[in-house]
């Protein structure tokens, strides 16, 4: 089962992709937002899918970001040794943390806005981890209790802004 959101930008509704079809869950769930995950929404969703006859999403509907605007998107740069070597960078001794704007989320087929004066726009397919509830000082043994799921994330960066102008990576 895959979570989807469909409809016009800014007016997406929650749904699921199951067995090759998209189903509308908007009669049962407000959205896939932080409160959905914090209130055991995935568990409730399983019950709804098993018990209800769900309407199909009409063909041709735009597919949006599967998660409604999260509070933050945290990223780790050069997160594995092979990638650091590919870029010619030294392997970091400490994780390189930076953030992405939540307003930059798009659907899988939406246009991506490239910054004016962009010189080195780059993209990478990343595995995103969706944290389902607030966490602080969580042990490694407990970490998976906080993971709600995973998303494929097309990470688009402007490398000249990010790496050649100094400062933090956030601006890239």
Show which residues each predicted segment covers.
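N-terminal non-catalytic cap/leader segment that marks the start of a structured domain
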Residues: 1-95
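Glycine-enriched loop-and-adjacent helix/strand subsegments that border the catalytic/binding cleft
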Residues: 70-172
């Amino acid at each position: 089962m895959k979570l989807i959101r469909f409809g016009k930008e800014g007016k997406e509704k929650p749904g699921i992709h199951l067995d090759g079809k998209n189903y509308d869950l908007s009669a049962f769930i407000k959205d896939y937002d932080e409160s959905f995950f914090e209130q055991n929404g995935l568990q409730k969703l399983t019950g709804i899918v098993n018990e209800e006859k769900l309407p199909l999403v009409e063909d041709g509907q735009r597919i949006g970001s599967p998660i409604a605007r999260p509070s933050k998107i945290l990223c780790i740069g050069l997160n594995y040794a092979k990638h650091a070597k590919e870029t010619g960078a030294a392997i970091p001794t400490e994780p390189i943390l930076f953030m992405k704007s939540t307003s930059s989320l798009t659907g899988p087929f939406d246009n991506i806005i490239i910054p004016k004066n962009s010189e080195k726009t780059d993209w990478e397919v990343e595995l995103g981890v969706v944290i389902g509830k607030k966490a602080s000082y969580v042990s490694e043994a407990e970490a998976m209790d906080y993971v709600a799921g995973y998303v494929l994330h097309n990470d688009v960066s402007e490398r000249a802004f990010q790496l050649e102008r100094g400062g933090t990576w956030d601006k890239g």
